[in-house]
């Protein structure tokens, strides 16, 4: 059993899925992703997750060795990073009360925001959450991990290590794609 599975087992031991809500076919899954959320997805959040590329709210089908396999919505997993992200941020704007690390203020929350990666010409990636405060011109980019870090991490591709792809503070006013925001 992998470390990730051991941690997930421990989570279930301390907070089991109620029998009426468990997915009888899949260990570590609710029968419905809605049961894994603290509150229902609002219209904007549901639309964002439905338009995302990760099948967070819908089952997927694929053929494996000639057999049709249906996988549940990813948010139905007790180890779902997207469910964790939504449970932390919810439907309403997020408020940061202190300015110890991030500027205090109220931030609009967008889930599955598409943003281009450092490799030119690639398809945009879906960011788990994007928080923006137009008044202070501040953006917070959130890529959340629940238990993924317990698996076998792969090395970063060379493109991610090339500093030429990254924004530098002194370029902020010369046409950077995010020049409307303060980055940190």
Set out the residue ranges of the language-model regions:
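Nuclease-adjacent, charged terminal/linker segments that flank catalytic cores
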Residues: 1-118, 124
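Hydrophobic transmembrane signal anchors and adjacent membrane-proximal interface regions, especially
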Residues: 88, 139, 165-167
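Residue-level marker of positions within ordered structural domains that often coincide
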Residues: 93-94, 134, 147
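A Trp-anchored, charged/polar loop motif used as the substrate-binding/catalytic surface
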Residues: 120-129, 182-184
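A short, conserved, highly charged catalytic patch centered on acidic carboxylates
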Residues: 129, 145-155
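Active-site beta-strand-loop-beta-strand hairpin of nuclease catalytic cores
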Residues: 130-141
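Acidic, metal/cofactor-coordinating or nucleic-acid-engaging core segments within structured domains
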Residues: 151-184
């Amino acid at each position: 059993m992998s470390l990730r599975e051991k941690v997930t087992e421990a989570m279930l031991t301390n907070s089991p899925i109620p029998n009426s809500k468990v997915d009888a076919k899949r260990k570590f899954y609710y029968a419905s992703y809605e049961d894994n959320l603290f509150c229902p997805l609002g219209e904007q959040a549901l639309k964002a997750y439905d338009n995302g590329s990760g099948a967070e709210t819908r089952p997927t089908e694929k053929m494996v060795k000639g057999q049709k396999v249906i996988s549940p919505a990813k948010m139905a997993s007790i180890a779902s990073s997207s469910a964790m992200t939504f449970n932390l941020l919810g439907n309403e704007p997020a408020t940061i009360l202190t300015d110890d690390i991030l500027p205090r203020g109220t931030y609009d929350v967008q889930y599955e925001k598409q943003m281009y990666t450092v490799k030119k010409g690639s398809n945009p990636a879906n960011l788990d959450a994007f928080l923006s405060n137009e008044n202070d011109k501040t953006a917070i980019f959130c890529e959340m991990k629940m238990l993924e870090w317990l698996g076998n991490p792969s090395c970063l591709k060379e493109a991610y290590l090339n500093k030429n792809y990254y924004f530098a503070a002194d370029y902020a006013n010369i046409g950077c794609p995010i020049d409307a925001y303060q980055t940190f």
